[in-house]
């Protein structure tokens, strides 16, 4: 009987640890999203982005929201450039992306995983010659991978974070 109780306690502990990791990963993604979004205003002004792009950002983490606006890709590329996350060739700068993730709460392992996912998405879309279109497809691929890991932050928590910073 005592052995069964120990096993139950072990399983419960492992489950709770797994839940905590998922929650903390979603929290890191929230911090990354809000940190990345700090460049949105500058890019919106520089690129004269339409309101539809702002709506796309508002709905970015919703799985059922279809991202189709090429301007969204232009905005993401502009924002990534502001944080030195891309090279002159418009490719992911692995070292800077890794450090950006760590500076927003990711541990080394999670930062590596995020960079790897972005690199995989970048590789899958390499045949797209239009930088904005390719960046949009990379973002869609990345969003799908994050949802697959159950790391996507809720829009409510992101909005709360953004509103408290205003």
Swiss-Prot record:
Pfam families: PBP_GOBP. The keyword Repeat does not apply. Belongs to the PBP/GOBP family. Disulfide bonds join 43-78, 74-132, 121-141. Transmembrane segments: none annotated. This is General odorant-binding protein 1. Residues 1-24 form the signal peptide. It comes from Epiphyas postvittana. Keywords: Disulfide bond, Olfaction, Sensory transduction, Signal, Transport. GO terms for biological process: sensory perception of smell. Coiled coil: none annotated. Antenna. One of its GO terms (molecular function) is odorant binding. InterPro entries: Odorant/phero-bd_Lep, PBP/GOBP, PBP_GOBP_sf. Present in the aqueous fluid surrounding olfactory sensory dendrites and are thought to aid in the capture and transport of hydrophobic odorants into and through this fluid.
């Amino acid at each position: 009987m005592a052995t069964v109780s120990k096993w139950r306690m072990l399983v419960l502990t492992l489950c709770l640890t797994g839940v905590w990791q998922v929650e903390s990963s979603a929290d890191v993604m929230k911090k990354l999203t809000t940190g990345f979004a700090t460049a949105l205003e500058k890019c919106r002004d520089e690129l004269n982005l339409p309101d539809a792009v702002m709506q796309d950002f508002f709905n970015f983490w919703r799985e059922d929201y279809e991202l189709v606006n090429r301007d969204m890709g232009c905005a993401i590329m502009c924002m990534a450039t502001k944080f030195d996350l891309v090279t002159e060739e418009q490719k992911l700068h692995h070292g800077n992306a890794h450090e950006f993730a760590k500076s927003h709460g990711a541990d080394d392992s999670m930062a590596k995983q995020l960079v790897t996912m972005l690199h995989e998405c970048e590789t899958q879309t390499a045949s797209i010659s239009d930088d904005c279109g390719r960046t949009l497809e990379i973002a869609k691929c990345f969003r799908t991978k994050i949802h697959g890991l159950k790391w996507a932050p809720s829009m409510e928590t992101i909005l709360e974070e953004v509103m408290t910073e205003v």
